[in-house]
């Protein structure tokens, strides 16, 4: 059989197209090359003329060329460098041996504890749980924080956001939740954090105990692609444990820096900055990640807390607004409460858990509603009370709120090491309100 005919027949069953090409153009966050036809999401690498390599992911596929965003920085690369196809799609190691380890989004361990022994490689991008396969959120997920357990009760498989400006106490609260919950597995994604904050989070917020945790970290000096896919890699690890029938706590800090990474990539690709500098892809990326959390029938659950850095304490920020519309609840931290020395500084009047009323008893619901009503009365009349314009006896309910003010503030404040069971939080609520 002629060689040309043999090649044509083989091409019908196998992809025999070239798997290498060369760099044509280099831009700050995107490299263009030609020579073969990869698909969007494929992983390629540049062999630089100085002997080093740079791995990237294809984000643009055209007839004559393709563009990819690098995972690491491309200093030293030049036009004409060789580009090789590596694999179809990004995978990440999963398995029980990941517990206690710290990894980067490329699956490399960064904790100096030796080589990683993993079970298999799992795809980083997966389809969220089908709507009709989602289990109902009907069980309490206790986190050991009084103001959350008592007033913003979380459910197993719920997705919540922690919204706050910088320096208000998001990381401390997330550490309390991680240590206070009873989930056997905790997966933590630290995205866009300063390098020094990674060991600080482990030692200060987790008290050095990583035995039930897997931590995926992409620091602020990593490339936009590393920061973007760090969150997806961590979610793939959480899904592995969920599929084993386990209940998983997923913590991510922060969604804002995750969206900023996609903003850098989107703008490099020429997307219009439509919403306060964010291109459409940055906003559409949030549900792709967040909807992967939840409870699945005949499997386990992923209860997720996503921190959202609110620029200038503006809750109408596009990322905060988009996140709030996707999540099942929001916990708003208040700079004013921080100034008053109340920690965790949760603004219970601006916060909400959309499933709370369905997972706690009627008596617990009544307690939570009454506490919020009395606290709201205090806030509405705070100035009148301070300047002495309010006379006791004018409003029976406000009188009760004033008498219980110290006890209510004591309930909202909690030392980060004084975590307590769910039942104890409601017992304390009942004592205050009786």
Which stretches of residues belong to each language-model region?
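P-loop NTPase nucleotide-binding/switch module
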Residues: 81-83, 110-158, 171-176, 209-222, ...
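Acidic-enriched and Gly/Ser
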Residues: 2-141
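Short, charged, intrinsically disordered terminal tails
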Residues: 1-11, 425-434
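P-loop NTPase catalytic core
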Residues: 150-151, 157-434
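Phosphate-interacting basic helix/loop segments used at nucleotide- and nucleic-acid interfaces
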Residues: 5-7, 86, 143-148, 234, ...
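A generic structural signal for well-ordered coil/turn residues at beta-strand boundaries
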Residues: 19, 27, 40, 98, ...
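Short, low-complexity, polar/charged sequence segments that are solvent-exposed and flexible
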Residues: 42-43, 51-52, 65, 77-78, ...
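Glycine/charge-rich, flexible interdomain linkers and switch-proximal surface loops
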Residues: 97-101, 149, 234
């Amino acid at each position: 059989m002629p060689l040309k005919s043999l090649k044509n027949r083989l091409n019908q069953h196998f992809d025999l197209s070239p798997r290498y090409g060369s760099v044509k153009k280099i831009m700050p966050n995107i490299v263009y090359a030609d020579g073969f036809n990869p698909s969007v999401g494929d992983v390629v690498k540049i062999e630089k003329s100085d002997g080093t390599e740079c791995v990237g992911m294809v984000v643009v596929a055209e007839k004559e060329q393709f563009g990819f965003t690098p995972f690491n920085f491309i200093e030293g690369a030049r036009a004409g460098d060789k580009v090789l196809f590596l694999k179809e799609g990004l995978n990440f190691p999963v398995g029980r041996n990941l517990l206690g380890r710290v990894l980067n989004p490329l699956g490399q361990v960064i904790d100096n504890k030796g080589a990683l022994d993993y079970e298999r490689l799992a795809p980083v991008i997966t389809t969220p749980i089908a709507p009709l396969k989602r289990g109902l959120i009907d069980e309490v997920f206790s986190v050991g924080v009084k103001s959350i357990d008592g007033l913003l009760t979380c459910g197993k498989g719920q997705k919540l956001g922690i919204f706050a400006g910088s320096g208000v106490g998001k990381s401390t609260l997330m550490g309390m939740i991680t240590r206070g919950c009873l989930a056997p597995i905790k997966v933590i994604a630290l995205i866009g954090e300063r390098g020094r904050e990674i060991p600080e989070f482990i030692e200060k917020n987790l008290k050095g105990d990583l035995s039930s945790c897997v931590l995926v970290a992409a620091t602020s000096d990593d490339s936009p692609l590393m920061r973007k896919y760090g969150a997806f890699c961590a979610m793939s690890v959480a899904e592995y444990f969920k599929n084993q029938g386990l209940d998983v706590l997923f913590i991510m800090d922060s969604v804002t820096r995750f969206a900023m990474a996609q903003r850098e990539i989107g703008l490099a690709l020429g997307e219009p900055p439509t919403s306060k500098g964010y291109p459409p892809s940055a906003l559409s990326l949030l549900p792709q990640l967040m909807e992967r959390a939840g409870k699945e029938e005949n499997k386990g659950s992923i209860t997720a807390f996503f921190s959202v850095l609110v620029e200038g304490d503006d809750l109408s920020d596009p990322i905060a607004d988009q996140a709030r519309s996707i999540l099942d609840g929001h916990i708003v931290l208040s700079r004013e409460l921080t100034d008053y020395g109340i920690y965790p500084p949760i603004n219970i009047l601006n916060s909400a858990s959309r499933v709370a009323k369905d997972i706690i008893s009627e008596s617990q619901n009544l307690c939570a509603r009454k506490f919020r009503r009395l606290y709201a009365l205090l806030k509405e009349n705070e100035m009148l009370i301070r300047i002495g314009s309010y006379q006791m006896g004018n409003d029976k309910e406000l009188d009760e709120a004033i008498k219980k003010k110290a006890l209510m503030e004591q309930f909202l404040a909690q030392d980060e090491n004084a975590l307590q069971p769910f039942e104890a939080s409601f017992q304390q609520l009942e004592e205050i309100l009786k």
